[in-house]
C-alpha cells in the first residue's frame, strides 16, 4: 500500500463559532463558504477544497484523519491488501465521499481505535487560497497538510499495523525520561513517513487515548517570522500555549504548540526536514528537542 499524504482532519465541536474564530484569528485558515453551513465548517489552507472539516455534535474531539492514495487503482489495491490481512473497513459511500470532496473513501480503525479514512481524487477549489492573516502559504504541495500524533496504549501493536498493513516507513524511534528524576517514566514514540518527503506523517505516542481523541496535529508555514506572528496571535487571543518555541531533534521543525478548541494541540511550525528516503537510515532519538519546547499543560 502506498499512502501519499495526510489529506484532511475531521473534528467534532459543540461550538462551531469558536472554531471559526480560532481558524480565522489565530491559525490564518480560510473558510470555504460554498461548503460550510450552520452545522459544518470547512477550512482551507491551500488549493484543496478543505483540510479541516469541523462538524457540530455533542463533544469536542477528533473524529478521523483522512489519507490520500494516488488514484483508483491504488485505492482498490489498498482495499485488496486490507482484505488479505483480514482488516475490517467500511465503504463510506457516495454521500460521504461528496462531503469529503473525494471520489471514493473507506473508514477503518487502527489497533488503538484511532479512526482513519482512505480516499483518492481529492478536489481542488475553484477559488484561490487567501489566508485571513496574510500568511504567504502553508507547506502542503506534494506533502499533505501536515502530520498527526496518535495515542497508542499498545505501541508495538499499533506500530506494526502502520508498517505492515498501511505501508508506512520508519523515520524515528524516540524514547526519553519524562522529567529529571531517576525513576521518571519513559516516553516512547514511533515516527513514520508515507510516500512523500515529509519526515513523518504519523507518530504514535505510548499512552491511553486522551479525551480529545488526538495528541496533536501540525501545520507548517514558509518562514520563521510566520511562526512568530502565529505565536503572537495565539497569545493575543488568550489561546493556551502548550509548548514554548523550540526546534525538534528529529524533523528539525522550529515550532510552538497551542491548544485547539477540541482540546488537542496544534503544532505551528517551520523548516521541517524533507527527506530523501533513498539515502536515509532510521533514527533513534534520545531527546525531543535541541532547545525550547517547554511543555505547559492547561490549568483546567
Language model regions located:
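N-terminal beta-strand motif that seeds the catalytic metal site of vicinal oxygen chelate
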Residues: 1-17, 62-67, 123-156, 169-171, ...
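Conserved active-site tyrosine of GNAT-family acetyltransferases
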Residues: 19-24, 82, 113, 158, ...
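Short, charged/polar, Gly/Pro-enriched secondary-structure boundary elements
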Residues: 48-53, 113-116, 198-202, 264-265
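Conserved donor-binding loop and adjoining core beta-sheet/short helix segment
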Residues: 34-70, 93-95
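A compositional/structural signature marking long, glycine- and acidic/polar-rich segments
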Residues: 184, 189-190, 194-195, 199-249
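Vicinal oxygen chelate
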Residues: 5-14, 57-153, 187-193, 238-300, ...
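Core segments of cupin and vicinal oxygen chelate
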Residues: 1-50, 150-199
Amino acid at each position: 500500500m502506498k499512502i501519499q499524504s495526510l489529506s484532511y482532519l475531521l473534528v467534532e465541536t459543540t461550538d462551531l463559532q469558536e472554531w471559526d474564530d480560532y481558524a480565522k484569528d489565530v491559525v490564518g485558515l480560510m473558510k470555504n463558504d460554498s461548503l460550510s453551513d450552520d452545522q459544518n465548517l470547512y477550512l482551507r489552507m491551500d488549493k484543496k477544497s478543505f483540510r479541516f472539516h469541523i462538524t457540530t455534535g455533542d463533544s469536542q474531539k477528533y473524529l478521523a484523519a483522512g489519507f490520500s492514495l494516488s488514484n483508483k487503482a491504488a485505492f482498490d489495491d489498498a482495499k485488496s491488501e486490507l482484505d488479505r490481512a483480514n482488516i475490517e473497513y467500511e465503504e463510506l459511500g457516495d454521500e460521504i465521499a461528496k462531503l469529503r470532496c473525494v471520489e471514493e473513501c473507506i473508514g477503518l480503525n487502527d489497533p488503538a481505535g484511532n479512526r482513519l479514512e482512505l480516499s483518492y481524487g481529492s478536489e481542488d477549489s475553484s477559488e484561490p487560497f487567501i489566508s485571513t492573516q496574510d500568511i504567504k502559504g502553508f507547506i502542503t504541495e506534494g506533502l499533505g497538510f501536515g502530520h498527526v500524533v496518535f495515542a497508542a496504549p499498545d505501541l508495538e501493536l499499533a506500530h506494526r499495523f502502520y508498517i505492515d498493513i498501511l505501508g508506512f516507513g520508519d523515520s524515528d524511534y524516540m524514547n526519553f525520561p519524562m522529567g529529571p528524576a531517576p525513576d521518571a517514566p519513559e516516553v516512547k514514540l514511533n515516527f513514520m513517513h508515507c510516500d512523500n518527503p515529509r519526515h513523518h506523517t504519523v507518530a504514535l505516542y505510548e499512552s491511553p487515548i486522551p479525551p480529545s481523541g488526538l495528541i496533536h496535529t501540525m501545520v507548517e508555514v514558509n518562514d520563521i517570522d510566520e511562526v512568530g506572528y502565529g505565536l503572537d496571535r495565539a497569545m493575543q487571543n488568550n489561546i493556551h500555549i502548550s509548548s514554548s518555541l523550540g526546534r525538534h531533534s528529529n524533523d528539525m521543525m522550529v515550532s510552538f504548540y497551542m491548544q485547539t478548541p477540541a482540546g488537542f494541540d496544534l503544532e505551528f511550525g517551520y523548516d521541517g526536514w524533507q527527506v530523501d528516503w533513498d539515502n536515509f537510515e532510521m533514527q533513534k532519538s534520545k531527546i525531543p528537542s535541541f532547545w525550547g519546547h517547554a511543555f505547559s499543560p492547561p490549568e483546567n
